[in-house]
A protein has these predicted regions:
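Contiguous alpha-helical segments
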Residues: 1-65, 102-132
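Histidine-centered nuclease catalytic patch
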Residues: 52-90, 96-103
């Protein structure tokens, strides 16, 4: 599977370029993004774990699997702000793609009501602290 993905990327540089440009444009349109301090605060809030699965994302060894997921995707007009983001394993972030969090999350085998409540706590906390 990895070889297929690598080959696809090599054969489709134009598609990757267009995707990356569209993504950057959406991020620019949807807000300022997250500061490093906000990112660290978010990671600490979730104990350096994936908000969805609870898998540990801390440490250098996990740099390649750690990502930030937009709860409401940018393509659905979600904001590129800290209150719309959670730490996610890159695999689950890609799996969710452009779906809203709840519709995707409740179908996952690792779904947890406790973690869902933690996500809602984060949204409430971050909105109160950062939303103007």
């Amino acid at each position: 599977m990895l070889e297929y993905k690598k080959q696809w990327r090599e054969n489709n540089p134009d598609k990757i370029f267009n995707y990356n440009n569209k993504r950057r444009q959406l991020e620019e349109e949807q807000g300022n993004g997250i500061t490093k301090g906000q990112w660290l605060e978010m990671m600490n809030f979730f104990d350096w774990k994936c908000a969805y699965s609870g898998e540990y994302l801390g440490g250098k060894q996990n740099d390649n699997i750690r990502s930030i997921d937009h709860i409401i995707p940018l393509v659905l007009k979600g904001e590129n702000e800290v209150w719309n983001c959670v730490p996610s394993h890159v695999f689950y972030n890609k799996s969710k793609h452009d779906k809203e969090m709840l519709e995707w999350y409740i179908l996952q085998p690792f779904y947890s009501e406790e973690r869902l409540n933690k996500i809602y706590e984060w949204i409430k906390y971050a909105e109160k602290k950062y939303k103007k």
